[in-house]
Amino acid sequence: MQSHSKKRVCYYYDSDIGNYYYGQGHPMKPHRIRMTHNLLLNYGLYRKMEIYRPHKATADEMTKFHSDEYVRFLRSIRPDNMSEYNKQMQRFNVGEDCPVFDGLYEFCQLSAGGSVAAAVKLNKQASEICINWGGGLHHAKKSEASGFCYVNDIVLGILELLKYHQRVLYIDIDVHHGDGVEEAFYTTDRVMTVSFHKYGEYFPGTGDLRDIGAGKGKYYAVNIPLRDGMDDDAYESIFVPIISKVMETFQPAAVVLQCGADSLTGDRLGCFNLTVKGHGKCVEFVKKYNLPFLMVGGGGYTIRNVSRCWTYETSVALAVEIANELPYNDYFEYFGPDFKLHISPSNMTNQNTSEYLEKIKNRLFENLRMLPHAPGVQIQAIPEDAINDESDDEDKVDKDDRLPQSDKDKRIVPENEYSDSEDEGEGGRRDNRSYKGQRKRPRLDKDTNSNKASSETSSEIKDEKEKGDGADGEESTASNTNSNNNSNNKSDNDAGATANAGSGSGSGSGAGAKGAKENNI
């Protein structure tokens, strides 16, 4: 492992992403992605990387993993026609944690499009690190929404990476178990999933130490079940040795890191005690392996801390040091009273004793010893890329272009979007009963009003500062909106790999309980 610090970094962002609104009181706020973007612009980080507007993923791209019927449902459902879809909403688990809101399908298209385009960029060796903070929606299943996630952009990105890379490692540092990604690849030895998460009476209720994969995928699912209060030192003490052993044993050709920020201290739904620096150390450590590296977002419900975290981790990817003093930005008042980048841990007790963590580590090392070193994989003919960068449909944008007033007028922020009084953050009430932080779904559970933002706030988006929709000082090519994948051949041609998770959402202990089917992976 060498530490070559400077790498080519590509960053995917669409300025519309912050307009989507899950509804009053819902903890998931896509606006955090716009806050992150604005902060990294004002730090000047945009000058150091290529910035692309992602294409909107097509239905054909989404059905590389998701069922045709589920994607058709997502395309059709709207707040004004929900009454026509009552049975399907129940079947696809849409309506509570995963509400129907204006632009739902387009939101899914942008999230998935960024991760797929990033994977294509890595496959073409046009970048060493790609970032999509709008992705990381790790709970979505083949035919089911779950935990605020509708389309699993991570699975789609990994399937794209598998066209060129024999083995892909997925690492998840969200406070919640990465169940959707694990389930999708539970029976293959080409993808290893490693999830560090809170376990025990906590959503989604999966991710036991004994859940290790099935069939050819046995021992290729790695779960690190943690307790409340996980702090920086404890996290590093288990993350570094486990990822080191995984790298040595699995020898991946590419890595995907889900950077869920709900593992930070003070998160509205989380229960860990990590600082931004402690969270960022995971990015720093994985980066040192010099592998094609896809970084995606995920959870994070104290949104000022989410934007702090992802801005800092963008700087880590770029190997650029940034000041602790926050630059003035469009959301500056929400970072008070200190207006600093880094946050301090709370005084909560760390319930993860060194003995407990050592026991977990030793058990996982025993499992990893069962693996052959660098399993051989027969690579078939490489299918066409999901994105054709050289088509005439390229969306060329200039970083320093100012958007027209009509685009400004579309940007609306609901009242109280950032208010601590709405349960958010340090010192606020933490009434999470109706949300995933407190819900535990059955482990083998089978799938069985307009929320549009309505008013502008005084914190109107200032597009003059949004210079980041292109490459620095020159035009940057956005991904083509046309997919070249043929959905009729998707089962056979995804580099011999298609994730075929069963539609259930649970995870079993040991072999066979996932219901994932193997299909040439």
From Swiss-Prot:
Catalytic reactions of this protein: N(6)-acetyl-L-lysyl-[histone] + H2O = L-lysyl-[histone] + acetate
Coiled coil: none
Domain of life: Eukaryota
Annotated GO MF terms: DNA-binding transcription factor binding; histone deacetylase activity; histone H4K12 deacetylase activity, hydrolytic mechanism; histone H4K16 deacetylase activity, hydrolytic mechanism; histone H4K5 deacetylase activity, hydrolytic mechanism; histone H4K8 deacetylase activity, hydrolytic mechanism; transcription corepressor activity
Keywords: Chromatin regulator, Developmental protein, Hydrolase, Nucleus, Phosphoprotein, Repressor, Transcription, Transcription regulation
Catalytic EC class: hydrolase
Bias type Acidic residues, positions: 386-395
Pfam family, one: Hist_deacetyl
GO biological process: blastoderm segmentation; chromatin organization; chromosome condensation; dendrite guidance; determination of adult lifespan; heterochromatin formation; negative regulation of axonogenesis; negative regulation of DNA-templated transcription
Modified residues (Phosphothreonine): T457
Ranges of compositional bias, category Basic and acidic residues: 396-414, 459-470
Bias type Gly residues, positions: 503-513
A GO CC term attached to the entry: ESC/E(Z) complex
Localization terms from the record: Nucleus
InterPro entries reported in the protein's UniProt record: HDAC_PDAC, His_deacetylse, His_deacetylse_1, His_deacetylse_dom, His_deacetylse_dom_sf, Ureohydrolase_dom_sf
Effects seen without this gene: RNAi-mediated knockdown results in loss of type II neuroblasts.
Oligomer and partners: Component of a form of the Esc/E(z) complex present specifically during early embryogenesis which is composed of Caf1-55, esc, E(z), Su(z)12, Pcl and HDAC1. The Esc/E(z) complex may also associate with Pcl and HDAC1 during early embryogenesis. This complex is distinct from the PRC1 complex, which contains many other PcG proteins like Pc, Ph, Psc, Su(z)2. The 2 complexes however cooperate and interact together during the first 3 hours of development to establish PcG silencing. Interacts with the histone methyltransferase Su(var)3-9.
Protein family: Belongs to the histone deacetylase family. HD type 1 subfamily.
PANTHER family recorded: HISTONE DEACETYLASE HDAC1, HISTONE DEACETYLASE HDAC1-RELATED
Protein name listed in UniProt: Histone deacetylase HDAC1
